[in-house]
Amino acid sequence: MQLAKVLGTVVSTSKTPNLTGVKLLLVQFLDTKGQPLERYEVAGDVVGAGLNEWVLVARGSAARKERGNGDRPLDAMVVGIIDTVNVASGSLYNKRDDGR
């Protein structure tokens, strides 16, 4: 899994039928210091994540296993909303504080 921040939603009115009803989010991956990387992904969302929230993103076959998504063409899935991230040097992220 990887840490990412939700940048927004992706709306697609014309898509493969097995993606109907799947909420899509634009996420930006974060490094080990919580800084944004220049890597983005469109990910399915099964947890109801919102704008600017830090999330856990599963990729590849792990993403497709979540909630029976095996037949959906999903390479990435938001599988968790992060409350806190703590490292040896202290708190990296706290949702209550809305950032660092």
From Swiss-Prot:
GO molecular function: structural constituent of carboxysome shell
GO cellular component, one term: carboxysome
Assembly notes: Homopentamer. Interacts with full-length CcmM.
Subcellular localization: Carboxysome
Top-level taxonomic group: Bacteria
PROSITE patterns: BMV (PS51932)
Entry text on domains: The tight homopentamer forms a pore with an opening of about 5 Angstroms in diameter which opens into a wider tunnel at the base of the truncated pyramid. The pore is positively charged.
Keyword annotations of the record: Bacterial microcompartment, Carbon dioxide fixation, Carboxysome, Photosynthesis
BMV domain mapped to chain residues: 1-83
HAMAP family listed in its UniProt record: CcmL
Gene source species: Synechocystis sp. (strain ATCC 27184 / PCC 6803 / Kazusa)
Function in brief: Probably forms vertices in the carboxysome, a polyhedral inclusion where RuBisCO (ribulose bisphosphate carboxylase, rbcL-rbcS) is sequestered. Has been modeled to induce curvature upon insertion into an otherwise flat hexagonal molecular layer of CcmK subunits.
Gene expressing this chain: ccmL
Family: Belongs to the CcmL/EutN family. CcmL subfamily.
Protein name: Carboxysome shell vertex protein CcmL
GO biological process: carbon fixation; photosynthesis
Pfam families: EutN_CcmL
